[in-house]
Amino acid sequence: MANTPGAKKAVRKIARRTEVNTARRSRVRTFLRKFEEALASGDAGAAKAAFVQAQSELMRAVSKGVVHKNTGARKVSRLAARLKKLSAA
């Protein structure tokens, strides 16, 4: 339990940041799911549009510190590879 006023304030700040970061992470997952659905449909155009949105959202999460830089880069790379595979087919 936080005893000092500074510690109590830190607990409040952490709670607020956790809420914001959870919302950001959820938003990233939503865009990733939309990309997955576009891939499953087999429509290259829709998949490309969904990829651009998912990439943008992932990189925004990286810049906000919600996702580590390397994790974001790895996810984008894998999404791009899957999009390329669909476009080639």
Curated annotation (Swiss-Prot):
One of its GO terms (cellular component) is small ribosomal subunit. One of its GO terms (molecular function) is small ribosomal subunit rRNA binding. It comes from the Bacteria. GO terms for biological process: translation. Keywords: Ribonucleoprotein, Ribosomal protein, RNA-binding, rRNA-binding. SUPFAM superfamilies: Ribosomal protein S20 (SSF46992). InterPro entries: Ribosomal_bS20 (IPR002583), Ribosomal_bS20_sf (IPR036510). It holds the Pfam family Ribosomal_S20p. PANTHER family: 30S RIBOSOMAL PROTEIN S20, SMALL RIBOSOMAL SUBUNIT PROTEIN BS20C. Binds directly to 16S ribosomal RNA. Belongs to the bacterial ribosomal protein bS20 family. This is Small ribosomal subunit protein bS20.
